[in-house]
Amino acid sequence: MTNIYFPDEEVTVNDLYFVCYMVERIARQLKQPNKYVVNTLGKQALREKLSLANVLHCDNPDAVAYDWIEGYGLQPGEYDVSKVNPRYTDHIPTATQMGKVYSRLVVSTLQEGEDYADGMIRVYNHPICEIIDDYNSSAYYEPSYVLTRSYWAGSFN
């Protein structure tokens, strides 16, 4: 993907990882599904964030989250990924870990003609994300190739 502000630069996988991490962080803070954040930002804003990620990652993540929440009118909800059954797990993955999971899934399923923003919208709106984000299951820590295969199959079965 070409940087929209600096056409001679490419957006890197690390830039994608940062934006996926911020999506996860903001979604958790607002108690919203990840796809709410991605869909509310939209394709153009995602392209902007991806193009600025190499600079934004140096800022305080709380300040970046605040700017995105205020700038795009993101609202709190009731979706809380941290509510897990203690019989199944006693911890949840960090926002950085889930940012890595989702950035890998975007890259591994990127289709011809798509940029990272298109891939993010497609992946975060796929039903498989409801399973990945259910931390009572083990889906989120499956190897990348298993997540990719499950994405294309539409389930983990």
Where are these regions (language model features)?
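Short, surface-exposed acidic
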Residues: K31-N39, P76-V81, E112-A117
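Long, compositionally biased
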Residues: M1, N54-D90, T94
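Intrinsically disordered, low-complexity linkers and terminal tails enriched in Pro/Gly
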Residues: M1-T2, N157
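Amphipathic alpha-helical interaction surfaces
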Residues: R47, S51, D67-E78, R104-Q111
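A structured, charge-rich N-terminal accessory region that forms the first stable segment of a protein
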Residues: F6, E10-V13, Y88-L110, G119-I132
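N-terminal interaction modules that seed assembly of large macromolecular complexes
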Residues: F6-D67
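Glycine-rich, aromatic-bearing surface loops/beta-hairpins
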Residues: Y124-N157
